[in-house]
Regions:
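Short beta-strand segments within Ig-like beta-sandwich modules, predominantly Fibronectin type-III
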Residues: 62-69
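A detector of repeated loop/turn-to-beta-strand junctions in beta-rich toroidal repeat architectures
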Residues: 49, 125-129, 141, 151, ...
């Protein structure tokens, strides 16, 4: 039975909750996400909320704070590049629990986007280069390095707050490769897909990288790897139908694939990332098309563009299945472009239109038209972006 007051607030320690357990932290852009397990014994009164506090020295937990009613809690306004640990307190009407044990350290990072730049629009062919830029600061992309194998048609990339990853690609590749997002340089082999395929599309939270579809049989297969451990993919389940040359995105719990890439459609389907199984219908996009870009925050998933050089941007609330709602328009209509994000800003990179090297951005929480961000190093299509602070790692 709960029998303590942690001293944070409250008057009756006998009725305060037991301590929170299982505290873990992961870094985002100027923030950390703190996950935890609520106590079984809530005390005499139900738990009304939780407080997460950050520390840079493991002693003074006053470097930042966040509140919430469930796990995870985000602690914002932290310093990129500084390591933090976190503790969590549970609160009810009578008081506050003793502090949890400290999490392992997590380091916020600038929301860097890394983009496999794809196929040049000027006829010079496929490119192995990777571009990068800081999502929080408008401007042009710079060279990051090269893929481990020259290929395009990889759909969306994925990864964690530290690793960017790509899978499959032209020539029916089975390659999975990765980069360390904070350090420019060439990609390294991670492992192999279950079979070689191009036109697949990937998504991730901070622990699992999931790839779906592709032009090679079985074209409805979903497969996954654990991001922290190099190795080959395992079977996850099946998409609702065969799909290729499409795009995808995720938050920390759900992954979404948009349209089907072969013949116009408006389908959205989803999986629960932590649980292997088949895809489920989510709803419909605002337009029918092929190859619409996708990106997400922790709450919203966004689609943009598509075949016929669509300008349309639409959004859904990830936690609630249903049809997309109009968000706004791109600065120029295009298709075969990728999207990625920080916790607040989404970017669309490249595409088939002229100029094909354009980067647009939106503020994910606020509907409206996209704004010019800058340019990629090439004018390309089939771009495949990911970032250190996309929806799945917040």
């Amino acid at each position: 039975m709960a029998n303590r007051n942690g001293g944070f607030i409250g008057t009756d320690g006998l009725d305060a909750p037991d301590p929170v357990t299982g505290v873990a932290a992961s870094g985002g852009g100027a923030s950390i996400s703190v996950s935890f397990t609520a106590p079984t014994d809530a005390g005499t009164s139900a738990i009304t909320g939780f407080v997460a506090q950050a520390s840079t020295d493991g002693t003074n937990y006053s470097a930042g704070s966040g509140t919430g009613t469930s796990s995870p809690i985000t602690i914002s306004s932290l310093t990129n590049g500084t390591a933090y640990t976190a503790k969590v307190w549970a609160i009810n009407a009578y008081g506050t629990s003793a502090p949890s044990g400290a999490s392992s350290s997590a380091t916020p990072v600038a929301p860097r986007a890394v983009i496999a730049i794809g196929q040049a629009n000027d006829g010079s062919g496929n490119k192995e280069e990777i571009d990068y830029f800081d999502i929080s600061t408008t401007g042009n992309a710079a060279d990051f390095g090269n893929l481990s194998v020259l290929r395009v048609a990889m759909g969306s990339g994925g990864g964690s707050s530290t690793r960017g990853m790509w899978a499959g690609g032209s020539g029916a590749s089975d390659v999975i490769d990765y980069v360390t997002i904070a350090s420019t340089g060439n990609a390294t082999d991670f492992g192999n897909l279950l079979s070689a395929t191009q036109g697949c599309s990937s998504l991730s939270n901070d622990t699992r990288f999931i790839t779906g579809g592709g032009s090679s049989s079985p074209a409805d297969r979903i497969q996954y790897v654990t991001i922290a451990s190099t190795g080959n993919a395992q079977n996850f389940g099946d998409l609702t139908k065969n799909k290729a040359e499409f795009y995808s995105t995720a938050n920390s719990t759900r992954g979404l694939w948009f349209t089907k890439g072969s013949g116009n459609s408006n389908e959205i389907e989803y999986v629960t990332i932590a649980s292997t199984g088949d895809g489920t219908d989510f709803g419909d996009m605002t337009v029918e098309c092929e190859s619409a870009a996708a990106l997400a925050s922790s709450t919203r998933a966004i689609h943009g563009g598509g075949s016929g050089n669509k300008v349309d941007i639409g959004y859904v609330t990830i936690a609630s299945t249903g049809n997309a709602t109009d968000f706004g328009d791109l600065t120029v209509g295009r298709t075969r472009m990728g999207g990625t994000s920080s916790s607040t800003r989404g970017v669309f990179c490249g595409g088939t239109a002229s100029p094909g090297g354009v980067i647009d951005y939106i503020t994910i929480a606020s509907t409206g038209d996209a704004t010019d961000f800058g340019d990629m190093t090439y004018t390309t299509q089939y771009t495949s972006p990911t970032s250190a602070a996309h929806g799945g790692v917040q």
